[in-house]
Amino acid sequence: KVGESNDRTIKGDSEYSWALQDISFDVKQGDIIGIIGKNGAGKSTLLKILSKVTGPSKGTIKSKGRIAALLEVGTGFHPELTGRENIFLNGTILGMTKKEVATKLDEIVEFAGVERYLDTPVKRYSSGMMVRLGFSVAAHLEPEILIVDEVLAVGDAEFQKKCIGKMSDVAKGGRTILFVSHNMGSVKALCNKGILLENGRKVFEGSVNDTIAKYVINKVDT
């Protein structure tokens, strides 16, 4: 549960503006929630707080289970380590043993399409390669909660479609997904619920179709 999660950004010398304010919602096991809104609505800040990358200035987050997040290009990767080493590093962070990660290694590498560069430091990867490997690691290491930001837009259309399919498979296993995207087609195809943010506040929560409709109406009105 997210209770009044807030994050502040400095505005001027002494004034503060809240990036998020008065947000509260429950996420149940197996929910696939699309979080939508215009640029600057607070979507990425919310995901950072839920992923525990950033702490809320006020309020609390209560969660159960392992959380894997893909928030930005290179999230969770050490640039000097190879792709292989980073896969094992991320598995360790999620509380997995080396043996558990090893059983997933081939599947992760094949999905990401980085076989030739597996033992190359990731600082030499292109942004597209980083995103492919980052998503593959997050999705295949079986977290209870998967959080994915708009970073998938860096990949090509074919890979984005592949990711939507994989997230759908993950969700069928009873896992929870929080997904931010400006691609309403992807949100509609994947999610069963939606949350609409506007100026750091939750202005609507409901079925994914109703949430998208509200978002479109708000865009037309402005």
Regions found by a protein language model. Give the residues of each.
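Pre-NBD coupling/linker segments of ABC/ABC-like ATPases
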Residues: 1-22, 208-222
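Conserved ABC ATPase "signature" region
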Residues: 3-6, 88, 100-117
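The feature captures the beta-strand-to-loop junction immediately N-terminal to the Walker
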Residues: 36-38
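H-loop/switch region of ABC-family ATPase nucleotide-binding domains
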Residues: 181-182
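Conserved catalytic segment of ABC-fold P-loop ATPases
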Residues: 189-196
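Conserved ABC ATPase "signature" C-loop
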Residues: 199-200, 215
